[in-house]
Amino acid sequence: MLRTACSRSHVFKAFSSSLMLEHALAAANSSGAAAPTNAASTGNSHDSTLKSELPLRTLNDELHNAERKYIKPLTNAPEWSSTRTGPNSKIREYLKNGQYTKLLIRLSVDNHLNNEYISGLFTTGGLTKSEYSLFINKLLSEEELDVKLSNVIPDTPHTELIYKLYEFYCDHIVDQHNLTPLQLYDLNLFLKTFIAEAQLSKAHNVLDFILLRRPLNDLLANTDVEILIQFLRLKCGALSKFWKIQPASQRNSTAITLGEKASDCHLAKSYKFQNEKVLLQIINSVLGEHNWKNRRSPKLDAAIIYSLGYLGQTDLIEKYVNRTWSPSKDEGVKTNPNSDLLVAVLTSYCVKEGNMRKGLEVLDRFIRDYPEVELDPLFWRRLLQLSSLLWDKKRDRKATLSHGCWTIMKQWHAQRQRKIPYDYGIMKELYPIFVRTKNKNGALEVITKSFFGAFIQPEFTIRPNELSLLCKYQRFILKMIALKGNYHKGFEFCQEWSFSSTNKFELQSYFMKWRGIHEQRRTSQSKQKAALQEKYDEMEEDDMLLGRLW
């Protein structure tokens, strides 16, 4: 056990990789708390207890609490290794080794997340509140958590397990009236998780719990950016993936949801704008109050633009953009816009006005004023998706708008001497456009420059859906080659652009199938032409005989 007199700087240096320290720093930064330049030394336990009861802690208090409650007990390695029995020691072993998913599985299977059992851990000291906060923070930050927690308890969705953890957090960690920056950070993680899983009712419960202890006026006064963004998403329509849009070529069909094509996107059954009055209040505070001047960000502006777009207030979008992002304005943000902001502008105009012209004009202005702006795959994916949805297949058989977006994407990368990065979402959006317009050259460009450019990388691991899409591109190209009668090019493609011997054999078989179909069509067309010619000759001969009789 570290001695109490050990300085905090020594503790942090010895355990700079401690997860709890990262958690406390992230919590303080996300809530806008300022870190003092000179940290005071550790005081007595009575002073620390008084600090923990304050409604808002400074970063220094959070670090002090992290050291006292978590770092010192965690660093007593000899004591841990000698304690081999009892469930409490096993829980701490999981925490020490970073096995947060396994800990949840153990609690779920052995105790079914029993409330009395968790309460007992807090009472007996088997689990501290700081350790539980760390557990929540790291668990919800793990990738593919839904896959790891699938079927932990039969017929119990993993979101129910997470919601159970949230209920424990509210009952045992949070004070009845106030929220610390660390607690606000943890609750925001629950919010993000439930929104990502399309569990909007659960997300609303978390947000309402936060608003009871920190109302909207307090969020605006304290410039709580992250929570305000979640508020706009849940109550003001800023969740664009749940928006409904009517495809241009299917005006009489059911509207589709913007996010339904994404393989990793969970969709809610319903999504409604719940609060129209507060949006103007939020905009006035963000633009008018001095404490927001250095707290605004492209992410927050994107959420506000989505909210305005959901209401159809495209005129206000242009005014907001001119007010916040005009380089000539002193109050304008001094950072560059990002893809999230540009996607918000484009989506809002396209979905509510039904055309991309105005949205593209605003985007051109952004790119002209901010030449260093980065357009990531998310931007190009949404650009192609919107162009496909607005494509009227009867009036525009060549998909001029979609191919124009594809050309702009290639030009943007070429001007910066970059290769087009591989992105499954982009390739998936392009495939039906190429097939419908029979654009073999575009598909060949995707195969040769994007797909195989990524697959040859040693660290790249192809997924089943990516492999399936690649095979679709290959078969489409071979079909178009076969139907044009270019047999040599077909076998050359199979030889050069197959990724395995099995794939090569399948491509050759597929090519021969369509080659046979093409030959049958040619033979059938030749017979039809011969029959028509014969019929014409007979008619001409009859006319000549009739002429002689006359």
Curated annotation (Swiss-Prot):
One of its GO terms (molecular function) is RNA binding. GO terms for biological process: regulation of translation. Pfam families: ATP13. The keyword Transit peptide applies. Keywords: Mitochondrion, RNA-binding, Transit peptide, Translation regulation. It is found in: Mitochondrion. One of its GO terms (cellular component) is mitochondrion. Belongs to the AEP2 family. Required for translation of the mitochondrial OLI1 transcript coding for the mitochondrial ATP synthase subunit 9. Binds to the 5'UTR of the OLI1 mRNA. This is ATPase expression protein 2, mitochondrial. The lineage of its organism: Eukaryota, Fungi, Dikarya, Ascomycota, Saccharomycotina.
